[in-house]
Amino acid sequence: MSQLSSTLKRYTESARYTDAHYAKSGYGAYTPSSYGANLAASLLEKEKLGFKPVPTSSFLTRPRTYGPSSLLDYDRGRPLLRPDITGGGKRAESQTRGTERPLGSGLSGGSGFPYGVTNNCLSYLPINAYDQGVTLTQKLDSQSDLARDFSSLRTSDSYRIDPRNLGRSPMLARTRKELCTLQGLYQTASCPEYLVDYLENYGRKGSASQVPSQAPPSRVPEIISPTYRPIGRYTLWETGKGQAPGPSRSSSPGRDGMNSKSAQGLAGLRNLGNTCFMNSILQCLSNTRELRDYCLQRLYMRDLHHGSNAHTALVEEFAKLIQTIWTSSPNDVVSPSEFKTQIQRYAPRFVGYNQQDAQEFLRFLLDGLHNEVNRVTLRPKSNPENLDHLPDDEKGRQMWRKYLEREDSRIGDLFVGQLKSSLTCTDCGYCSTVFDPFWDLSLPIAKRGYPEVTLMDCMRLFTKEDVLDGDEKPTCCRCRGRKRCIKKFSIQRFPKILVLHLKRFSESRIRTSKLTTFVNFPLRDLDLREFASENTNHAVYNLYAVSNHSGTTMGGHYTAYCRSPGTGEWHTFNDSSVTPMSSSQVRTSDAYLLFYELASPPSRM
């Protein structure tokens, strides 16, 4: 996968995404972290960045007020807890252990490259026909003209350009741009439906000034002329290579005997250009049973806000995408371009075709969905009250109640749990507790000198007692001074869907590296009761999805292993390719995000 530039500077300007509704702090004290802290400010420091001029033409034609501020200093009163960087105080490390990770770094690359726009940046901007040396009318005469154009470029449907030569040959780079343009024209001429869809979205024929080009991919697609079939606002691309346009579908070997019920949810997702991180997470969420039903049964409609300032586009496009996946045949490939448009409006860091981190994408996506279906329309004023006199269990319940007064959605019902952090003074024995909501847990990978560790080893390392001494000494409110303390984490409230992030990304002053340690995790009956802060019998989980990252920190690829909520069978989702797999193949050293669902009591007998 090619290395691309960072998010365009213009989409990280805080003024363009600032909403007064998001600029008010509400629930408790908020300590910024890498996920929710001053995103634009850290990106725009001139000493860190070397931005080149951005074209005046833009996909977003005017400043938007959609979604939260890109500064993300406040998340409508709820902290966006990024588990990879601790907050200002030692108590802020409520969901992670390990070193800080700089913004923009991830397993999918980015840490080894400067921010900015490279010379050959493939941006999400319309391509001007004049700049590309072709015009719409010249290239729509006939398919024979297009064939000659491809021939003059010494290319074919399967031609590949070595990206290593692009920097050495400006003419070759220009040829690649022309190839992308001609590709869109070829599709237009060969598929009348494509032209109709294009004209409906971008203007009638004769008034269009841009070439109907696809969003530039990171490489020349294998299918120059795929079968095109529109469904609603989404596009289904048949997977047959070299097919003639038409309504027929290519058959996949071994699937002819599958009935429609067993085949549901097995559509692939088209890679739009370094979007494997997005496709991997979307397939994992598509196989989350209750979230899938929430979209398929259109239950989200009753939670949408219909005011003049309401933002609902992200959840609507997400639901439509899930509906398309589950109503398509296994031979279909769904293009998530409409969804990508909305997620990059909500989180401008995903504008363009950069390599991104799957966990960061999951955090932004869940937060955006939660905000749009939050049942709380009018948040109460924050009235801090002292709960230290209450027993820990009662204090945890009160803190959870206060959280739900401000943040209450179906998304939160599924993914949000509560973490308990305790500090015990070694001098006087006083113990103070803090309760924080969490969306996932970032687990350090235990290093024991062996090539293999277990998931329970990682959980024990996450919850083990740490001694805070020296410069790390906190202030004891009883001793009224900085004292040596013992810190410990435990889980106060277990979520229905538990997402475990394996911290394979290791930072050092010299370089960034990826840990390839094999983590042995159970597929069934993950018993986490030993990590509960109070006695509970409802803390056993079953695995249903894994987001995998293969490769290095300089470049890699994301895939997903998912168990169908209907059939219980496992499949590999590799962008547009979906293949069956055995449950014995799920455990690999590429596992990055583990999705567990809370087991029902009968399954634990």
UniProtKB/Swiss-Prot annotation:
<keyword id="KW-0517">Myogenesis</keyword>
<feature type="domain" description="USP">
    <location>
        <begin position="267"/>
        <end position="599"/>
    </location>
</feature>
<keyword id="KW-0472">Membrane</keyword>
<feature type="region of interest" description="Disordered">
    <location>
        <begin position="237"/>
        <end position="264"/>
    </location>
</feature>
<dbReference type="InterPro" id="IPR050185">
    <property type="entry name" value="Ub_carboxyl-term_hydrolase"/>
</dbReference>
<dbReference type="GO" id="GO:0016020">
    <property type="term" value="C:membrane"/>
</dbReference>
<dbReference type="GO" id="GO:0004843">
    <property type="term" value="F:cysteine-type deubiquitinase activity"/>
</dbReference>
<feature type="compositionally biased region" description="Low complexity">
    <location>
        <begin position="245"/>
        <end position="255"/>
    </location>
</feature>
<dbReference type="GO" id="GO:0005654">
    <property type="term" value="C:nucleoplasm"/>
</dbReference>
<dbReference type="Pfam" id="PF00443">
    <property type="entry name" value="UCH"/>
</dbReference>
<keyword id="KW-0862">Zinc</keyword>
<keyword id="KW-0090">Biological rhythms</keyword>
<dbReference type="GO" id="GO:0005737">
    <property type="term" value="C:cytoplasm"/>
</dbReference>
<keyword id="KW-0645">Protease</keyword>
<dbReference type="GO" id="GO:0031625">
    <property type="term" value="F:ubiquitin protein ligase binding"/>
</dbReference>
<keyword id="KW-0539">Nucleus</keyword>
<dbReference type="InterPro" id="IPR038765">
    <property type="entry name" value="Papain-like_cys_pep_sf"/>
</dbReference>
<dbReference type="GO" id="GO:0045931">
    <property type="term" value="P:positive regulation of mitotic cell cycle"/>
</dbReference>
<dbReference type="GO" id="GO:0042802">
    <property type="term" value="F:identical protein binding"/>
</dbReference>
<dbReference type="GO" id="GO:0000122">
    <property type="term" value="P:negative regulation of transcription by RNA polymerase II"/>
</dbReference>
<dbReference type="GO" id="GO:0030332">
    <property type="term" value="F:cyclin binding"/>
</dbReference>
<dbReference type="GO" id="GO:0006508">
    <property type="term" value="P:proteolysis"/>
</dbReference>
<dbReference type="InterPro" id="IPR001394">
    <property type="entry name" value="Peptidase_C19_UCH"/>
</dbReference>
<protein>
    <recommendedName>
        <fullName>Ubiquitin carboxyl-terminal hydrolase 2</fullName>
        <ecNumber>3.4.19.12</ecNumber>
    </recommendedName>
</protein>
<dbReference type="GO" id="GO:0045475">
    <property type="term" value="P:locomotor rhythm"/>
</dbReference>
<dbReference type="GO" id="GO:0007517">
    <property type="term" value="P:muscle organ development"/>
</dbReference>
<dbReference type="GO" id="GO:0050821">
    <property type="term" value="P:protein stabilization"/>
</dbReference>
<feature type="active site" description="Proton acceptor">
    <location>
        <position position="557"/>
    </location>
</feature>
<comment type="function">
    <text>Hydrolase that deubiquitinates polyubiquitinated target proteins such as MDM2, MDM4 and CCND1. Isoform 1 and isoform 4 possess both ubiquitin-specific peptidase and isopeptidase activities. Deubiquitinates MDM2 without reversing MDM2-mediated p53/TP53 ubiquitination and thus indirectly promotes p53/TP53 degradation and limits p53 activity. Has no deubiquitinase activity against p53/TP53. Prevents MDM2-mediated degradation of MDM4. Plays a role in the G1/S cell-cycle progression in normal and cancer cells.</text>
</comment>
<feature type="binding site">
    <location>
        <position position="428"/>
    </location>
    <ligand>
        <name>Zn(2+)</name>
    </ligand>
</feature>
<keyword id="KW-0833">Ubl conjugation pathway</keyword>
<feature type="binding site">
    <location>
        <position position="476"/>
    </location>
    <ligand>
        <name>Zn(2+)</name>
    </ligand>
</feature>
<dbReference type="GO" id="GO:0048471">
    <property type="term" value="C:perinuclear region of cytoplasm"/>
</dbReference>
<keyword id="KW-0479">Metal-binding</keyword>
<dbReference type="InterPro" id="IPR018200">
    <property type="entry name" value="USP_CS"/>
</dbReference>
<keyword id="KW-0963">Cytoplasm</keyword>
<dbReference type="InterPro" id="IPR028889">
    <property type="entry name" value="USP_dom"/>
</dbReference>
<dbReference type="GO" id="GO:0043153">
    <property type="term" value="P:entrainment of circadian clock by photoperiod"/>
</dbReference>
<keyword id="KW-0378">Hydrolase</keyword>
<dbReference type="GO" id="GO:0005813">
    <property type="term" value="C:centrosome"/>
</dbReference>
<comment type="subunit">
    <text>Homooligomer. Found in trimeric complex with MDM2 and MDM4 and USP2. Interacts with CCND1; the interaction is direct and promotes its stabilization by antagonizing ubiquitin-dependent degradation. Interacts (via N-terminus and C-terminus) with MDM2. Interacts with MDM4. Interacts with PER1. Interacts with KCNQ1; counteracts the NEDD4L-specific down-regulation of I(Ks) and restore plasma membrane localization of KCNQ1. Isoform 4: Interacts with NHERF4 and CLTC.</text>
</comment>
<feature type="binding site">
    <location>
        <position position="479"/>
    </location>
    <ligand>
        <name>Zn(2+)</name>
    </ligand>
</feature>
